[in-house]
Regions:
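An N-cap/entry alpha-helix motif that binds or orients negatively charged groups
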Residues: 11-105, 211, 215-220, 225-295, ...
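A glycine-rich helix N-cap at a beta->alpha junction
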Residues: 164-172
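Glycine-rich active-site/cofactor-binding loop and its immediate structural neighborhood
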Residues: 108-147
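Acidic (Asp/Glu)-rich catalytic clusters
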Residues: 152-161, 184-185, 326-327
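C-terminal helical cap(s) of enzyme catalytic domains, especially alpha/beta-barrels
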Residues: 77, 209, 349-355, 399-419
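Alpha/beta enzyme core
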Residues: 119, 133, 175-368, 376-393, ...
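Active-site-adjacent helical/loop segments in soluble small-molecule enzymes
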Residues: 426
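Short, charged beta->alpha transition segments
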Residues: 95-105, 130, 143-155
Length: 442
């Protein structure tokens, strides 16, 4: 997202960096190859995933790559992209490709944003900041996770000038919801992305088998521990700890390691935190309040009076839910099944997008995530009705393999393949992709 003041030169710079991304990326790789140099990360989706698995711990891999139940929704996401096939067009004279799009009256250098991924400290303690810098370098806005490992304000600063949006999980504490919204506004966020599909955690066997929830070790709660309202809640919990039965913890080496992790991820010095009840109380407060199973449309409708930011509802799969979202004031929806992490055997995000676009028509702003791995996937999503997409696991895989440079290269590769696919399909711009013929759907 480009800031609202003095934006034109910044936007032109970002758009210029993306223009010609395909051939420029190929050229850099092939020229480096003359000297025996190879990319930091594999350029194919399967190779990237395999490399990431080798670089991640078992717990990190389970959380990042795992899905709900038997993984049927994750499989459906990929199968739907395999099933839908572009029909290239010839001799359209596409000398240059324009990847720019407009969302909520703002210009963006490409139709790709980085999806929010929580608990990224599983991969690197500074994962949010490293990813934000990669996003800034590639001109791709980052949707900062509500379950991040660095405070919103620090990550937002690192993401400039590409900009950022902020993801909101609706807490059981309304004052905390308001506090997070105010911080998003103050940080210069381009939109507020309210995640609807995680009012409770889905059944995730990979994490459950390991008994691993990163938040219970203090990972992924930095937006909370940097929030004044939240820390008031923590201190209230400490004062009432005499009647709290959650103090019964079996003393084991793993428990000691978890307490050390809580201390390290809590603000302040680790030694002081080890002697303080705050880190553990912060974790327990989070586990009891971070999501709200009672979230309903009436509550969502209050957002129009609580923020001036564009409001995006993430996690929509049903056409009637999409219609209701816009009726209560959403500016856009993200068609998403949370990367297959919530309901096993649900509809794929791409198939849902087709139905929602057919139901609502061309006007509403629809974004898509879940299942996107390549630039070709982005092109298919745009051709089938998405106005933009959120890219998730691939950039995290790149981060795991080669840090900031790895995340940056993954983003560059996705943009490069998207731009080349546009050229080969005869599309001069993103709007032109909407007219590209796709076979494999009714």
């Amino acid at each position: 997202m480009v800031s609202r003041s003095d934006t034109q030169s910044t936007f032109l710079s970002l758009a210029s960096a993306v223009a010609g991304a395909g051939r420029a990326r190929q050229d850099r790789i092939y020229r480096a190859g003359v000297s025996g140099l190879r990319p930091s990360v594999p350029t194919d989706a399967a190779g990237l995933e395999g490399a990431a698995r080798r670089h991640m711990s078992r717990k990190a891999w389970a959380y990042v790559a795992g899905g709900a139940g038997e993984g049927r929704t994750m499989d459906a996401n990929r199968e739907s992209f395999y099933r839908h096939r572009l029909v290239p067009r010839m001799a359209h004279g596409v000398k240059e490709r324009d990847l720019t799009v407009s969302l909520f009256g703002e210009d963006y250098a490409s139709p790709v944003l980085l999806a929010p991924i929580g608990a990224s400290a599983l991969v690197d303690k500074d994962a949010d900041l490293l990813t934000a810098r990669a996003a800034a370098a590639t001109g791709v806005p980052m949707v900062i996770s509500n379950q991040g490992c660095s405070p919103l304000e620090d990550t937002a600063a690192a993401a400039a000038p590409a900009g950022h949006w902020f993801q909101l999980y609706w807490s059981t504490d309304e004052e905390l919801v308001d506090s997070l919204i105010r911080r998003a506004e103050a940080s210069g966020a381009g939109a507020l992305v309210v995640t609807l599909d995680t009012t409770v955690l889905g059944w995730r066997p990979q994490d459950l088998t390991l008994g691993s929830l990163p938040f219970s070790r203090g990972q992924g709660i930095a937006q909370y521990t940097s929030d004044s309202r939240y820390m008031d809640m923590v201190r209230t919990k400490i004062r009432g700890a005499g009647s709290d039965s959650s103090g019964d913890v079996r003393i084991t080496p793993a428990a000691a390691a978890s307490l050390l992790s809580m201390a390290r991820h809590h603000p302040g010095r680790t030694l002081r935190n080890l002697l303080s009840p705050e880190p553990r109380a912060a974790v327990e407060t989070f586990l009891g309040t971070y999501s709200n199973p009672g979230l309903d449309w009436d509550m969502l409708a209050t957002l129009r009076d609580r923020t001036s930011l564009p409001v995006v509802f993430k996690g929509i799969l049903d056409p009637e839910d999409a219609e209701r979202a816009f009726a209560v004031g959403a500016d856009a929806v993200v068609v998403s099944n949370h990367g297959g992490r919530q309901v096993d055997g649900s509809v794929s995000s791409l198939d849902a997008l087709i139905e929602i676009r057919r139901h609502l028509g061309d006007e509403p702003t629809l974004l898509l995530d879940s299942g996107i791995r390549t630039g070709r996937d982005v092109a298919v999503a745009l051709a089938l009705g998405a106005d933009a997409v959120l890219l998730g696991r691939p950039w995290m895989y790149g981060l795991a393999v080669a840090g900031r440079r790895g995340a940056e290269e993954v983003i560059q590769n996705v943009l490069a393949e998207l731009e080349l696919t546009m050229a080969l399909c005869g599309a001069k711009n993103v709007a032109g992709l909407r007219g590209t013929r796709v076979v494999g759907h009714a």
